[in-house]
Curated annotation (Swiss-Prot):
Function, as annotated: Catalyzes the synthesis of beta-nicotinate D-ribonucleotide from nicotinate and 5-phospho-D-ribose 1-phosphate at the expense of ATP.
GO CC annotation, single: cytosol
One family name in Pfam for this protein: NAPRTase
UniProt name for this protein: Nicotinate phosphoribosyltransferase
Catalysed reactions, as listed in the record: nicotinate + 5-phospho-alpha-D-ribose 1-diphosphate + ATP + H2O = nicotinate beta-D-ribonucleotide + ADP + phosphate + diphosphate
Annotated SUPFAM superfamilies: Nicotinate/Quinolinate PRTase C-terminal domain-like, Nicotinate/Quinolinate PRTase N-terminal domain-like
Record-level GO BP terms: NAD biosynthetic process via the salvage pathway
Keyword NAD among UniProt keywords: no
EC number, as in UniProt: 6.3.4.21
Keywords attached to this entry: Ligase, Phosphoprotein, Pyridine nucleotide biosynthesis
Positions of modified residues (Phosphohistidine): H224
Posttranslational modification: Transiently phosphorylated on a His residue during the reaction cycle. Phosphorylation strongly increases the affinity for substrates and increases the rate of nicotinate D-ribonucleotide production. Dephosphorylation regenerates the low-affinity form of the enzyme, leading to product release.
């Protein structure tokens, strides 16, 4: 008999999160332990989530029961850049509901976070996973694990037919699907199948809990929040990206060297990404805009700096599926190293089921607005249109034809 796609507990452990939340959390502990931040949840497609408020609140309370086990700490101790003081702090860490406010406002589910960055940072991924799974339990209660498994094998078959053995040997794919997963059990099953039968190279997962459980490499470096926060932490706004990269370099000394380019725009980022950073960082991550045009821009930048692009890696993570990944791989093969982080299309792709379209983003740091503009107008996020206008002015980013969406 096929098993249900759901289990009682949605978030399995403190490690049931994206690896980059831990890498950023360590940097926050060492550099900004007392900085306050604010975050807001947004359902992008207007779906009515109000009926699920009570269960979401219950699952948030269950989060507060979680703590690191001795086995979890042993796993993290094997990661060379996880420092002893951070692991001691993480061993004491507990989620605290005082920093989370859930309610119904203007007929919409509202989730806000407000508190010290150090104590709020780990909420994002489990909160999104909770909203997604609670909603899916109500809307699709009879979903079976076999449906997700069969769908994944269909994708493997397509890939085997459409890619050559040489291409498959070089096609590097990772699971980046924790935050919008259909359920924990689906993500676990998908990763099991990927590990056993993926015809390309499975290079790891962003989910630390499952990386430990399945003996995979945990993957991730930094998120938009790291660069956004520095808009209010650095001495001048124009220097905020440089301040974010500099702080990262001081923390990790050349490790965890994939930088995210589209917090303002890639053009604005590359203006700050000089020879020093370009040599020190291993590569760049794409998260908005045309992926091949973006890659051409990055390759050209490396070449202008006298750096061989084949010594660098581009990571793609923007709404990917296997056909898109194969197209990008073919366009760039032999010119620069590439890797693909696939999220929703792996962990929430079940026939007849629409995945969640939602975000939980930082809106303020140290009491002042922060923003993400990105390389796509629809991904712009900020509560304060005046700050977005100021950010555009400072970084010489032209106005886009479509209006910015509020965070």
């Amino acid at each position: 008999m096929s098993e249900s796609a759901f289990s009682n507990r949605i978030v399995q452990s403190l490690l049931d999160t994206d690896f980059y939340k831990l890498t950023m959390m360590q940097a926050v502990l060492h550099n900004y332990p007392n900085v306050d931040v604010e975050w807001e949840f947004r359902c992008r497609n207007g779906e009515d989530l109000r009926p699920y408020l009570g269960e979401i609140q219950h699952q948030i309370e269950l989060l507060c029961e979680l703590s690191l086990s001795p086995e979890h700490l042993v796993f993290l101790e094997r990661i060379t850049f996880m420092k002893p003081d951070f692991l001691r702090f993480l061993g004491l860490f507990r989620f605290n509901t005082r920093y989370v406010k859930t309610s119904i406002e203007n007929d919409e589910l509202c989730i806000r976070l407000h508190g010290p960055w150090l104590h709020v940072i780990l909420f994002e991924v489990p909160l999104l996973a909770i909203v997604s799974e609670v909603r899916n339990r109500h809307r699709y209660p009879d979903t079976l694990l076999s449906q997700a498994r069969d769908r994944l094998y269909d994708k493997f078959e397509w890939l085997t037919v459409n890619a050559t053995p040489d291409e498959l040997a070089e096609l590097k794919v990772a699971d980046f699907g924790t935050r919008r997963r259909f359920s924990y059990r689906v993500q676990e099953e998908v990763l099991n199948v990927l590990k056993l039968d993926f015809p390309g190279q499975l290079v790891g997962t962003s989910n630390v809990h499952l990386a430990r459980q399945l003996d995979l490499k945990p993957l991730g470096t930094m998120a938009h929040e790291w660069i956004m926060a520095h808009q209010q932490l650095g001495p001048r706004l124009i220097d905020s990206q440089i301040a974010a990269l500099d702080c990262w370099v001081r923390e990790y000394r050349g490790l965890l060297g994939i930088a995210l380019t589209d917090c303002i725009t890639t053009d604005a980022f590359l203006n700050d990404f000089d020879l020093y950073f370009a040599k020190l960082f291993d590569g760049l991550r794409h998260d908005s805009g045309d992926p091949v045009k973006w890659a051409e821009k990055c390759i050209s930048h490396y070449q202008k700096l006298g750096i061989d692009p084949m010594s660098k890696t581009l990571v793609f993570s923007d709404g990917l599926n296997l056909p898109k990944a194969l197209d990008i791989f073919r366009a760039l093969r032999g010119r620069i190293n590439v890797s693909f982080g696939i999220g929703t299309n792996l962990t929430a792709d079940i026939p007849g089921i629409a995945p969640m379209n939602m975000v939980l983003k930082m809106t303020a740091c140290a009491g002042q607005a922060v923003a993400k503009i990105s390389d796509e107008s629809g991904k712009t996020q900020c509560k304060d249109p005046n700050f977005v206008a100021y950010l555009r002015h400072v970084f010489k980013v032209p106005d886009l034809p479509s209006p910015a969406k509020p965070a």
